[in-house]
Design a protein with these regions (language model features):
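Membrane-embedded architecture of ER/inner-membrane glycosylation machinery
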Residues: 1-136
Length: 136
């Protein structure tokens, strides 16, 4: 009976160590699984006045952007870019063609600033987010 309890204590001890290791070191290092965090980190490096995003409307991104973000469709994002002096638009890859067409209709010259890739685990799909400003 004592050996059984001793074995259970070892199992519990090593399970705790395993979970602490996984949740403290392994999961946070898998940046690909946290695209909103990647986006937030990239935004800190950029100079812009206002921000809009189309196609990637995740609550985590709104939270990390402290609510200073406009969720839009591709046409609204192009208009937003045209109306601002130093605005930034984030476009999810599946919305890119529509965004480019809308921008073209407004005679906007786009400059791609960044591109990040990640996995949107809430929807179970790979994503690509492109950062755009108006070319000067």
């Amino acid at each position: 009976f004592k050996k059984e309890i001793k074995f259970q204590n070892y199992v519990i001890f090593f399970s705790v160590i395993f979970y602490i290791t996984i949740f403290t070191f392994v999961l946070p290092s898998l940046k690909y699984l946290f695209p909103s965090k990647i986006i937030s980190d990239e935004l800190k490096k950029l100079n812009y006045e206002e921000l809009s995003v189309t196609g990637y409307h995740e609550p985590s991104l709104v939270f990390l952007a402290k609510g200073k973000i406009i969720l839009s469709d591709p046409n609204e994002a192009a208009i937003f870019l045209a109306e601002g002096n130093n605005n930034l638009v984030l476009v999810e890859g599946r919305e890119l063609d529509e965004f480019i067409n809308s921008s073209s209709n407004l005679n906007l010259k786009l400059k791609k600033i960044r591109e990040i890739k990640g996995f949107n685990y809430s929807k179970g799909q790979n994503i690509k987010i492109l950062f755009f400003k108006v070319a000067k």
